[in-house]
Amino acid sequence: FSEDEMCQLLSRLVEAEEFEQFLHTRYIGQKRFSLEGGESLIPLLDTLVESGAPQGVDEVVIGMAHRGRLNVLAHLLHKPYEHILSEFEGAADDGRGDTEGDVKYHMGYSYDHVTEAGRKVHLSLSYNPSHLELVDPVIEGIVYAKQAYLRDEEGTRVVPVLVHGEAAFTGQGIVAETLNLSELDGYGTGGTIHIIINNQLGYTATPQETRFSPYPTDVAKQIQAPVFHVNADNPESVVQAARVAMEFRQRFKVDVIIDMWCYRRYGHNEADDPTLTQPLMYQQIAQHASTLKLYTAQLVEKQRIELHEVNELHDRARGRLDEAQEVAKKLQVAPRTATFGGVWQGLSWATEDRSADTGVEREKLQRIAELATQAPEDFSLHRTVQRIVK
């Protein structure tokens, strides 16, 4: 890693940690499903985008549950802090109905990211319900449709990324179903990059209570996907795993899994006290330095960065959040997320007095019906099929 890469990695960890701590202290008790303990997810996703672009990636479509979602929205999708904080401040919905009343950690977003090399990559985070892993086949369908629209026959231009919890990855059958379809004609998308935020707890259940295999990724042996087990407290290893995963996916067009071992700094949500159910584990976590502190100490010791420079990064991150909160407090209505852009430009929601025009010309339907009941002259039909056709 070059000195610039190390400093950039440190900066992203600062932003991720400061964001979570800001929400923790300013909005006490509000649910946010913190990423703390797994902040390396942000540079991991950064790396997938930056390393994928020179390998032909034009779009990345992401599906994930609630853990760390706000952090991803803020720092990968660049959803403005003001918009996120306005939802914490209680700003009303705009009343137009598509996401009215939904919680902040279900929301999606899209963003056109320009890489350091100047290449544009379109990023999409799909909306998600509380039902864990339900979004998996939805993402695959979105990517399949995009690839068809772009005539991306090799599947290199649009890449699906699914972020899982380790308990859900083994516990939800929809994961196994999605894996099983991954390389079938009519379903395959050229490989999915799976990221497991392995915080070693499923709400209050330990791994021993949710599976009997050593790793949550063992369920993926059915498709023989390569798995990279990596320690989130070693962010450089996380970045390296992401680089290899993207290169492997682009070259071999198969699923790849990154099993990022980390921990959950607080409870399942902000109303959960984990010391009641995992007292020994949380005694250790309370004494454990954050990924950012560990990496900061490492870079300072190597003389890659001065401590005052690190403090400046923290001050800058806090300052941006403070400014955003002042703006958010003045917003009476939460800013609406733009829904119809890109290839959806010109479309709008159907209303009571407006329905979509779904009609097809009679001549076109007749022509389709005729072709559907014809067989090539040199094709020998089964006699039962022949009676139906003729």
Regions found by a protein language model. Give the residues of each.
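Short acidic loop-to-helix transition motifs that present clustered carboxylates
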Residues: 233-238
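Conserved internal helical-beta-strand scaffold that buttresses enzyme catalytic cores
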Residues: 1-175, 179-208, 212, 223-228, ...
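C-terminal catalytic or substrate-handling cores of phosphate/nucleotide-
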Residues: 229, 242-250, 255
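Flexible glycine-/small-residue-enriched beta->alpha junction loops
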Residues: 283-287
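Glycine-rich beta-alpha junction loops
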Residues: 66-68, 262-265
